[in-house]
Each structure stands twice: as C-alpha cells, then as structure tokens.
Amino acid sequence: MKIIFPILSNPVFRRTVKLLLCLLWIGYSQGTTHVLRFGGIFEYVESGPMGAEELAFRFAVNTINRNRTLLPNTTLTYDTQKINLYDSFEASKKACDQLSLGVAAIFGPSHSSSANAVQSICNALGVPHIQTRWKHQVSDNKDSFYVSLYPDFSSLSRAILDLVQFFKWKTVTVVYDDSTGLIRLQELIKAPSRYNLRLKIRQLPADTKDAKPLLKEMKRGKEFHVIFDCSHEMAAGILKQALAMGMMTEYYHYIFTTLDLFALDVEPYRYSGVNMTGFRILNTENTQVSSIIEKWSMERLQAPPKPDSGLLDGFMTTDAALMYDAVHVVSVAVQQFPQMTVSSLQCNRHKPWRFGTRFMSLIKEAHWEGLTGRITFNKTNGLRTDFDLDVISLKEEGLEKIGTWDPASGLNMTESQKGKPANITDSLSNRSLIVTTILEEPYVLFKKSDKPLYGNDRFEGYCIDLLRELSTILGFTYEIRLVEDGKYGAQDDANGQWNGMVRELIDHKADLAVAPLAITYVREKVIDFSKPFMTLGISILYRKPNGTNPGVFSFLNPLSPDIWMYILLAYLGVSCVLFVIARFSPYEWYNPHPCNPDSDVVENNFTLLNSFWFGVGALMQQGSELMPKALSTRIVGGIWWFFTLIIISSYTANLAAFLTVERMESPIDSADDLAKQTKIEYGAVEDGATMTFFKKSKISTYDKMWAFMSSRRQSVLVKSNEEGIQRVLTSDYAFLMESTTIEFVTQRNCNLTQIGGLIDSKGYGVGTPMGSPYRDKITIAILQLQEEGKLHMMKEKWWRGNGCPEEESKEASALGVQNIGGIFIVLAAGLVLSVFVAVGEFLYKSKKNAQLEKRSFCSAMVEELRMSLKCQRRLKHKPQAPVIVKTEEVINMHTFNDRRLPGKETMA
C-alpha cells in the first residue's frame, strides 16, 4: 500500500527544505578547517640549540594560525627535520620522508650542497622549494619549482660598488670566506677595468676562525679600505681580532656584505673611530615590523641559550626574518588556492603533484609587505626583485641609517638630510691623538724651566700654541712625540720608502704632524694636508757682508768707470768740434787792432788749446775768458754747459753717500749668483722639502744647484737648521731654507741676512694619514683661527725679537783722509805736473832768447833765471837790429791764428 504525504508534494515545503539544507551545509563548511602541512629542513651543529631559521619557521606558522586573518579556514602544521651541515644525502632522505607525509612546500635547507639535492627532488615531483639564503643560479636554470627571498647578489654587488664610488676609494681589498664569494662579488671584481680601481683579493682561512695572520698582513700592507664577504659569526670574530691588533681606528673603513651587521654587538667599537658600513634589509622603522620583532625577541629569549656568536640577545637575524616572510608569502598563495589538497608523493615513482604547477605560479605571483620590505619574484628564475636596502654606519650612538639603495634608483645617502646641525667636533671630541713633531725654533722647542717637566709641558713654540688652539676648538686631547729619526720626510729614490714624520703618518704611528712641514706634491700623494697655516718660500741665508770704508779715490765712485770714460770722450769730442766750427764760422774771426779798422788781419780765439780750455772750464763749473761769438759755436757751448750741469749735479748728489756710508758689498745677490760660482758652498736640510724642491726642479738654475749639492752631498747637506745656521756663521757657506725661519734667525743674529727674494712659494700645513677624517675638521679650525687673527698674533709672539740695533746715521759725520785723501793726491799731482811744465816752458823760452840774442844757451838761461828771481819788473828782451823785409812779404805773412781780410789791396 502506498502512503502519500501531501505536504511533501507542496512546492513551498520543498523550497524551505532546500534552503535549510543549504544553510546547514554552509554552517558545516564554515565550522570545518582545512589542514595544510609545510615541511622544513634545517642544518644544525651537533649538540647545538635550535637555529634561528627553524625558530622563525615555527614562529611564523604559529602567528598565522593565531591571527586567522590570512588563512581563516586553513590550519597550518609543519614537519621539521634536522640534518648535518653539508650532508646532501641526508637532506635528500629527509625531503623524501616529508613528501611521503604530504607537504605543500619545503623550506630549506640553507647550504648549497644540501639545497641543491632537495631542489632536484622538488623539481622532479612538482613541489615548491623555498630558499632564504643566497644560492648560485646558472644562466640556463631549469628549476621552475624554486623561489629565493634572499636579494640577488648581482644587485648586492652593485650596491657595494656604488658605496665604493661614493666613498671615492682608489684601492680596495676584498676578503671572502669561500669560493662563492667571488661569484657574489663579480660586479665589484669587474670594476677595476671600468672605474680605475686597484683591487686586492684575499681569502679567509678555511680551517680556522683565526684571522690574525691575514689581518697582520693587511696592516703591514696598509690596506685601509676592506670589504668582508663572510657570515655574521665570522664578522663578529674579525672585529674582535681587529680590535686586538689596533685596526679599529678612524683610518680603517670596513664594508660587510652580511645583512646581519645591525644585529652584531658593536658596543666595544662605538668610540674607536673605525668606519664600519653595511646593509640592512629588515625594515625596522615600520611600526608593525617592530611589533613582530618584539614578539619574536620575547620568544627568542625563552629559547635555550645560544653559543657566543657576537649577536645581540633577542635580535631577529636576516635569515630568520626572511624565513618568517617566506612562510607568509606561501600562505598568500594558499589563500588564493583554497581547493588545493596535498597528497603523499614517493621519490621513487616520479609522479608529480597535480596542484604543484598552479601553486608554484601563485607563489611567484604573490606580493607581500613583510619584515624585509616588498617581496616580489622574477617569474622566470624565482629570484627576488625590487627590494630596498638600508645603508647603515657605525656612529658613537651605535649603528645608524645613513642612506638607502634599491635596484632602480641606486644609492641615496640621506645622512645630511636628518636636519641635524653640522658640528665639526663630532669626530674629534673627546679623542686622544698622537701628534708627531720635530724640534725647530721657533715652531717647537724645549721649554726652559728650573723644574723638571714631563709630557706635553716640555715643549713650547708656535706649533705648540697652534696645537693648543686646535684642541680647544675641536675638543680633542693629544700627546706630543718627537719624530724618531729627526727628519721631516723624504722619499728614497732607491726603494721608494719614506722617512721622518711622513713615514710615521703613513704607518699610522701618529694621527697628526704639527710642525713646519711643507705641503709638496710628492708628500700629498702619500698623506693628507690641511689648508696651510703659514705661507712662505725658499730663500738664502748668508753672513752679513763686512762694511768697507771708502778708499782714497772713492770720490770717483759716484760714477762708474764707463761713465768717466764717456765723459772724457765727450770732452775731447766737444773740444774738437768747437775748434773746427770756430775755424769755419766767419763770425768767430775778429780784428785784433780795433783802432785800425783798415787792418786786413783777423784772429780767432778758439785755437785748439783754447777749445780744450773752454771745455775744462765749463766742466769744472768755473768758466773761462773765452766766449763764443757765432751762433754755431754758442750752440755747441750751450749744449756742453747743459751736459756738464747734469753730470756735475748727479755726481755731487751721489758723492756724499759714497764718502760717508760704509758700502755693504756681498759676493752673492741671488740664486743665480750662487749657481754661477763654486767658491761659496751652499746646501739645505737633508731629506727636507727644500732639498726635494731642488731635486725635482726642472729649471736650469735650480737643476744646476742640485747637481752641485748632490755632488758634495756629505759636505753641504746638513741634518737640521741649527747645523746649517752655525755653518753659515763659521764658514763661507750659504744655507737654503724657508723664509719664515730666516726672518726669525735674522731678528736674533745681526751677523746674518737674507739674500735675494723668494725662490718658490709654498705653505706649512697639518699632516694627517691618507684618508683621515680629521683633515677637514682641522682645516675648518685653521680657517677659523685665521679669520680671528690668532695665527697672526701667534706669529708676532714668536717672531718678534729684540732686533738688531739700527746703524747710526752718518749724515753729519766728519770726513777723514780715508774719505777724501784722493783729492789731495790729485791736487799734489797737478802741482807737480805744473812745476814740470813750468820748467819746460822756462827751458824753451831760454833757448828762444839765446837764439834771438845770439848768445849761448847757458848764459841766456842764467839771465832768465836771474830775472825770474827778482821780485821787480823785468825788461822785455830786445832783439838785434831788425831785418828789412819787403812790404809784400810782410803782408803775406800771418800766424796760424790770424788771416788777411779778403778784398784788401797789396801794400806798396
């Protein structure tokens, strides 16, 4: 019998039942959670605690399960396996065990050999393999089931290269841990050919953590710019060993490629001055990231104690952060693929997971803002792209962010954009510096005291005052040490080694060189200099020449011998010209008998002797009874008078100085005079800047001087300025030295003087080791002292001496025989000459009288002498009876000084 329920056939009832069943199914489905398993394989050291990656793996899974925001209907479980380091066989076995259990993805292991084994299995069975450490990828990589959250090292290598270029390094040492380091830093290794970079590559010891032999070798080689490619554990050990070896100073700059530099304990190095730079991918400035790291730290501190790795307690390492982000990225793909189920896979059957390809595509397409910033993958090779790195550097407050780097825009240094005011004392405040110097008066000298002095109190001088002012401005303390070899610093041509203060700066035995250290080209190539605190040049120190009294003929000195000769020639020439013109000019002839105007005899006063007498009278400013009548002769006379006026005035003006002032005649007046002679020896301080100047000079004069000095190196080059000054005083020696020191010496020793001007121009600066961060600070402080006038005041303090007594004025000094004795000699010579001439005239006249009176020469001479000795009138000699001569003959006769007037008739 068939029972019929009418209500079941009711359409409304049917719709209601369907709705209730649908609601029940929805409620059941919402109350049911899907379980998904992740696999993790982690290396461990035997008897060691759980690693950071495994802790982060578990922490991430637990966080997702607790929050229920990412996977509200899925519960994640995990299976973790531990393997020994570098055990690829065990890694393969553990991977197969997890695949047989059924896992959606396998995380780890980290090391390349084990990772490659697991990757091979995952790729064959279609299960995603997630890596958080760098692994070398070949160009034809076919591992499609692989992603890595670690930044691509080709990008990291470019970031390091950008840092090197930013710091303007010219020499770099790369220290790597294993052979993969050369692959990771390939962009940097290719740089020398493109960026003029000198690269030195070293490898850390593989079988020990003792890096001291390597560090010692680097210290000996003065390798101050170093890039370390190693783990954070090794980095912590290197820093400790470098500190013990004195390599944690401001002259060293280390770049670490590990992204865990921020997690190292840098407390012992904060005030060492060392420059330490690295990268950080963990976005600690994000508040959500900071909250997660804080929770991680709490759980991390509850974990078993870890061995001493140099890491700060509770800090999340980069590997841990990447593992945390990896779990979340895979979870994002799970969220987008809810119908995915896992199944047991067997390694020996080679049957891939049917959801693997789709799931792997979702993982590569996933985007996530995690602890390490933006996470996106290259869909072809699975490598991470488009990430940001923070550039961090060690400061006194610890590691601070100073910039950012990303693959698109490169390096962006933001340290100067923090809004902090510039403070030049930041890197020098409260630091203790070693200062090398050299004894050189007045720059550095021992302080005179009755009590024993110690330390810096032993010294005083210009450079000591300068150092004290710099320390006041910059806030540093210092210890003064005298240079061991007592030299400034020069390079040996044979081996290229330096000595003196320059050597101590190169070897970092001193932080500063505050001394009269000249800034030169060759020194600037090996050390750094501040701006000059004093400018100067090379000059010549020589004995002040002894004064020479004027000689008896010093009245001739106002005019040079050439001028005297020219005056004599001019006198002779003018006298002859006057004689000739007077003979030719008709207006110079006159009638000797003005009472007889009809006389045809005329005479000319300017005979040859009278012409010479006229010239002498004008030259002596005395004149003569002879006066020119013609215009032509007057022109000659006027020009001669003007000439003698200028000559006599110039002579008179200079005569007083030459007769009253002692002449200081020096055998040398310039460097050219030194180079042209060999009698006076000359030299400089050995291995000093002055010697180097002549040694490197290409100017012929200075090159010739260096040839002289080098040929007599043992005898002319001295050890110090004091030795050179003493030699100038005691021998015929000229000392080449700085003009400022010459100025100081001549103020205190009146027997010395500076010869000539400056040979070159240079400056004294504060020396620092190459690349020292102190140079710019000291330069600013020196400029400040210069603007305040303190440099000038210090120079006045140390250069101002008692001075040499001024020479007494000799304007009113009486002239002695030694001054004008020559004039008396000339007078005496003139008198003697006149006597001889008078005797000659007497004899000549006596002979004429004897001929005229027809008697003997002796009687005529006696008669002439008798008449000359009488102080009465003398009678004119009467000649014999006149001889009758015809009128025509008388008219035609005339002397050399007269002539007959033209046009007169012959006398009858």
From Swiss-Prot:
Q: What keywords tag this UniProt record?
A: Cell membrane, Disease variant, Disulfide bond, Epilepsy, Glycoprotein, Intellectual disability, Ion channel, Ion transport, Isopeptide bond, Ligand-gated ion channel, Membrane, Phosphoprotein, Postsynaptic cell membrane, Receptor, Signal, Synapse, Transmembrane, Transmembrane helix, Transport, Ubl conjugation
Species per Swiss-Prot/TrEMBL record: Homo sapiens
What result is annotated for mutating I567V?
A: In RNA edited version
Where are the annotated glycans? N67, N73, N275, N378, N412, N423, N430, N546, N751
Bilayer-crossing residues are: 562-582, 636-656, 820-840
GO BP annotation list: behavioral fear response; chemical synaptic transmission; detection of cold stimulus involved in thermoception; glutamate receptor signaling pathway; inhibitory postsynaptic potential; intracellular calcium ion homeostasis; modulation of chemical synaptic transmission; modulation of excitatory postsynaptic potential
Q: What is this protein called?
A: Glutamate receptor ionotropic, kainate 2
Instruction: Quote the annotated effect of Y571C.
Output: In RNA edited version
* Tissue/organ expression: Expression is higher in cerebellum than in cerebral cortex.
Q: Which cysteines are joined by disulfide bonds?
A: C96-C347, C750-C804
Q: What does this protein do?
A: Ionotropic glutamate receptor that functions as a cation permeable ligand-gated ion channel, gated by L-glutamate and the glutamatergic agonist kainic acid. L-glutamate acts as an excitatory neurotransmitter at many synapses in the central nervous system. Binding of the excitatory neurotransmitter L-glutamate induces a conformation change, leading to the opening of the cation channel, and thereby converts the chemical signal to an electrical impulse. The receptor then desensitizes rapidly and enters a transient inactive state, characterized by the presence of bound agonist. Independent of its ionotropic glutamate receptor activity, acts as a thermoreceptor conferring sensitivity to cold temperatures. Functions in dorsal root ganglion neurons.
Listed under GO cellular component are: dendrite cytoplasm; glutamatergic synapse; hippocampal mossy fiber to CA3 synapse; kainate selective glutamate receptor complex; mossy fiber rosette; perikaryon; plasma membrane; postsynaptic density membrane
User: What's the PTM story here?
Assistant: Sumoylation mediates kainate receptor-mediated endocytosis and regulates synaptic transmission. Sumoylation is enhanced by PIAS3 and desumoylated by SENP1.
Covalent cross-link site, Glycyl lysine isopeptide (Lys-Gly) (interchain with G-Cter in SUMO1): K886
Q: Which residues bind L-glutamate?
A: P516, A518, R523, A689, T690, E738
Gene Ontology molecular function: extracellularly glutamate-gated ion channel activity; glutamate-gated calcium ion channel activity; glutamate-gated receptor activity; identical protein binding; kainate selective glutamate receptor activity; ligand-gated monoatomic ion channel activity involved in regulation of presynaptic membrane potential; PDZ domain binding; scaffold protein binding
Additional comments on file?
The postsynaptic actions of Glu are mediated by a variety of receptors that are named according to their selective agonists. This receptor binds domoate > kainate > quisqualate > 6-cyano-7-nitroquinoxaline-2,3-dione > L-glutamate = 6,7-dinitroquinoxaline-2,3-dione > dihydrokainate.
